[in-house]
Amino acid sequence: MRYSIIVPVYNRPDEVNELLESLTRQEEKDFEVVIVEDGSKTPCQKVCDQYAGRLDLHYFMKPNSGPGQSRNYGAERAKGDYLLILDSDVVLPEGYLTAISKELDREPADAFGGPDCAHSSFTPTQKAISYSMTSFFTTGGIRGGKKKLDKFYPRSFNMGVRRCLLYTS
């Protein structure tokens, strides 16, 4: 299997539904979805059950420990050559996995990512919020009351990494 899509979830069944729906529209089918419910009070298992026949989907419920540990929990159970770590609010455009596959076939990489972008249907306010959450100046620079740019700390989500870099088996 080429890809394992790992999604930590906390009280977001509606978002998970949108993400899973976008995954059903991918041309590339060589992937599994690993949903890790992180102690949610509003679980998404019923949503996941609706996609059981349409996606290779694995649902895990665990006590709340935060998104980082939930990503790791999912990664430990994943089978794909590449781990794609997404948040539950992601909606993948059609052709996303095909585009990644073509690029990895052309030039293999151990890790990859890219900028977030606001969907074309977003309102100006939604686009401004998206920019404020994804711009270099906010995600790795000026935030938390700082007055100048600081070290850039890359995010730990919406990225892909080759599984063999993290696990030997």
Language-model segment annotations:
Residues 118, 141-161:
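A recurrent flexible, glycine/aromatic-enriched loop bordering the glycosyltransferase active site
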Residues 95-127, 131:
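Conserved donor NDP-sugar-binding/catalytic core segment of glycosyltransferases
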Residues 2-4, 32:
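Cell-envelope/extracellular polymer assembly enzymes that use nucleotide-activated donors
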Residues 62-78, 99, 156-157:
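Glycine-rich, basic loop-to-helix element that forms the pyrophosphate-binding segment
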Residues 21-30:
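Short, acidic, metal-binding catalytic loop of nucleotide-sugar glycosyltransferases
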